[in-house]
């Protein structure tokens, strides 16, 4: 059991809680397969405690870096099989929160829907939170988020539909959630991207004073990131790339607003993307359109390739 041919079957709230508790106990499930056999109703859980935990990186005066001993990665393969998680209250008390808070380098979450009966809420002053994952170093594939983001916590930053911070691959994902109340920076798919985002789509209405992007808030080249100083992650590609993505959602804000990306730093790459939706700027009108302009002086025209913007 637990193989690709005979995965562990998850069919109930109890199974989800068991997986969450086991990962919290330090079991990463590297190479182990899980598969949903039906929709999972989490309504009997007042607040689902998430799968995995990210406490960040630690260092010493010698420049050595390591993962916090509190980190708990999910390294297995979780196949939603086209089914949905329903009626969950996902309460982000800490940074880097989602249904899966930490998807490790070998982890895969795919074919999973977080439907509109789920509610994401948050403590004040948290960052990098999303319906599906807090931080991803692995692969998120063919997942859809439609959760309710109608909470009122203050100073919530890097709020996203799919993943708060991405170093891995996000492909074939869709956000349908509107984000118009809480949150100081918002995106449909990824909050901060150092990895690859492709063939993904935002359909949600995103509104904020600033830092609003249909696909990602920030697209970055992560050269020099502390994560790369840890042997297990030295081979990570941390050049932010966004390709074949579409924003269909209305976007509005005062500054750093983009149909695809709000801010493109340090030679992040964007290609074959489209923003057919009109987005609105107000007050200072400091907004960015593809492909001519971006907010952080990417000088090479090759950073934007074959993009279309009707805003």
Task: Label every PLM stretch briefly.
Residues 1-311:
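Surface-exposed repetitive/solenoidal architectures
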């Amino acid at each position: 059991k637990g193989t690709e041919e005979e995965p562990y079957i998850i069919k109930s709230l109890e199974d989800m809680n068991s997986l969450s508790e086991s990962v919290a106990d330090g079991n990463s499930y590297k190479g182990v397969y899980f598969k949903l056999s039906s929709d999972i109703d989490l309504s009997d859980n007042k607040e689902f405690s998430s799968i995995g935990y990210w406490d960040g990186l630690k260092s010493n005066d010698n420049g050595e870096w390591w993962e916090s001993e509190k980190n708990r990665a999910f390294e297995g393969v979780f196949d939603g099989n086209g089914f949905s998680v329903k009626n969950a209250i996902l309460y982000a008390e800490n940074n880097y929160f989602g249904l899966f808070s930490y998807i490790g380098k070998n982890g895969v979450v795919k074919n999973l829907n977080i439907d509109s009966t789920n509610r994401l809420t948050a403590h004040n002053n948290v960052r990098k939170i999303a319906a599906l994952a807090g931080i991803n170093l692995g692969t998120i594939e063919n997942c859809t988020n439609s959760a309710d983001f109608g909470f009122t916590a203050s100073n919530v930053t890097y709020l996203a539909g799919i993943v708060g911070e991405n170093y891995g691959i996000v492909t074939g994902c869709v956000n349908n959630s509107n984000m118009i109340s809480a949150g100081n920076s918002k995106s449909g798919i990824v909050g901060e991207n150092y990895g690859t985002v492709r063939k993904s789509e935002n359909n949600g209405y995103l509104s904020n004073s600033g830092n609003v992007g249909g696909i990602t808030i920030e697209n970055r080249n992560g050269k020099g990131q502390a994560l790369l100083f840890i042997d297990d992650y030295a081979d990570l590609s941390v050049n932010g790339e966004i390709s074949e993505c579409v924003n269909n959602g209305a976007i509005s804000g005062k500054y750093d607003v983009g149909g695809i990306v709000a801010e493109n730093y340090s030679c992040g790459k964007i290609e074959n993307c489209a923003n057919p939706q009109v987005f609105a700027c107000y007050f200072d009108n400091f907004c960015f359109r593809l492909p001519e302009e971006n907010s952080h002086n990417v000088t090479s025209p090759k950073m934007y390739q074959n993009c279309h913007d009707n805003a």
